[in-house]
Amino acid sequence: MLDIQIAVSKINKYATRESGDTVEVVERPLGGFTLMLVDGQGSGRASKLISQLVASKVLALIKDGARDGVVARAAHDYLYLHRAGKVSATLALCTVDLNTRTLVLTRNSHCPIAVYGPAPLGLRWLDAEAQPLGLYRTTRPVVEEVDLAPGTCVVTFSDGILEAGRRAGRDWDV
C-alpha cells in the first residue's frame, strides 16, 4: 500500500502582513495529485495577487488533465501576456503520478528541489538553471521524473528559505 504524506509550513515575512506564496494540492483527473508552490515577485498584496493569478491558471489546467510541462509553459505564457513581461513568479510542481508510479518534479524557480530516496538514489538536489515565469518569451520549465519508492522524500521551498538571514549577513547554507 502506498502511503503519501504532505506537510506545508508557512511563516509570514517580517513586517509584512501578506506573503506572495500560494500553496495548493489538487487531485489529478487521471489519478494522482499535484502539490503546487507559486511565489509572486516582490512582497505584500501585489505579490499575492500575482501568485494567485498564476495558481488559478495552474489549477485549472491540472484539473483539465494537462501534464506538468504543458501547465508550466501555459502559466508562463498567461503571466507574460497579462503583465507584458514586467512581473515574474516562481513555480514548483510536485506530482505523484499513480499510473507511471513516478514523481514528476517541475520547476521554474532558482530554488532547488531536494529528493531523498533509498539507495542508490540517496540525496539529490535538482538544481538545474530554471527561469521564473513571466519575464522572457521562451521560458521553459525544468522537469525531472523519479521512480516512486518507499522512503522517498521531496522537499521544495520558496526563496524565503533560500534567502533567510541574508540581509543580516547570516545566510543559511541550504
Stretches with model-predicted labels:
Residues 1-20, 27-31, 58, 66, ...:
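Intrinsically disordered, low-complexity terminal regulatory regions
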Residues 2-20, 76-81, 111-145:
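PP2C/PPM family metal-dependent serine/threonine protein phosphatase catalytic domain
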Residues 3-5, 29-33, 98-102, 149-150:
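Beta-strand-turn-beta hairpins that frame and shape the catalytic cleft
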Residues 16-33, 89-91, 125-168:
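Acidic loop->beta-strand submotif enriched in PP2C/PPM serine/threonine phosphatases
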Residues 48-120, 141:
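Catalytic core of PPM/PP2C metal-dependent serine/threonine phosphatase domains
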